[in-house]
């Protein structure tokens, strides 16, 4: 209903990848796990959202009921409202299945932010921001049979079945890991076969020693603002005056937009006032460059992925380089000072005033996991031109393209 041509108006590659995080069409399969009814007025352009989902779920053999109000615009008619509420009342009286009662599951996600469905959790994807799908059913022999796509690491509640068959690999479930953990971990091997992890292996992998993308620590940049965050402003001398002015404008824009659209106050401290407790409790949003922000200068050489360099001459990300006098760096990464939290450089939300005003359909990530922006003192509302943007893989590394 936004009237965008899927070819002519196609988004830049990075935006197109992360758009799927919030695009409902990529989650149609999940309607198999919960009763769904939707409504649209016959004359409402947004009825297209309902009918599109009905078409997609139909192709997947998933039930989805659509109520259409005859002659109505963007509002209910009395009969449709009654039927809509009766549907929800009936289903709420039944409630969701209790633990262990669900025998069949069909689940898909584009992001580890939304990784759990009942007794299943997708802990890693093979390819980030692409659909990871798990479908399965518990048979009469107490065996859970699963098929997967784009999943690299799974957790299953142990009590649901005695054994599990994942993509043809038959493995112990209820008695796995010596029966000492509530969930059992399963890892995909390079040849596509799956293995079950023992007690010590499970404890180790749950700590994420190799710093993989995991639920709640998977990007993109905007994901950092779904938890407690703290902005850290530099107090030193920037490598270039333009970089200092740019980072201040970005911070000011974030504060103003957050106050207006989220009705909250962005917390800001100086790099000299940052404490260990703050590092432990918050995602850190660092503004400045290695000259002006001592915290940024400290964490930059410690990033886990491909080398990131920022000095007075250049910004280098992997094999790519830009002039530091004319460009600024934006990225998200696990914080080397607290690997359970994010660190973000020079960015608030990557959507802005015009997107808030347009529609909530426009509030999707614009810069992926990392970007280099051209500094521009003339850019309205501190916006800068994107010279490059990209996404990290499951190991927080960039491709070598």
Question: Model segments located where?
Answer:
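Cell-envelope and extracellular/periplasmic
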Residues: 1, 20-21, 32-43, 225, ...
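Structured segments of extracytoplasmic/periplasmic soluble domains
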Residues: 30, 34, 56-60, 87-95, ...
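C-terminal catalytic histidine-bearing segment of alpha/beta-hydrolase fold enzymes
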Residues: 39, 43-147
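Solvent-exposed alpha-helical segments and adjacent loops
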Residues: 145, 156-401
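Short, solvent-exposed loop/turn and secondary-structure capping segments
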Residues: 2-7, 48-51, 67, 78-80, ...
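Extracellular beta-sheet-rich ligand-binding/adhesion modules
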Residues: 140, 149-157
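Solvent-exposed, acidic/flexible segments
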Residues: 17, 21-24, 43-50, 77, ...
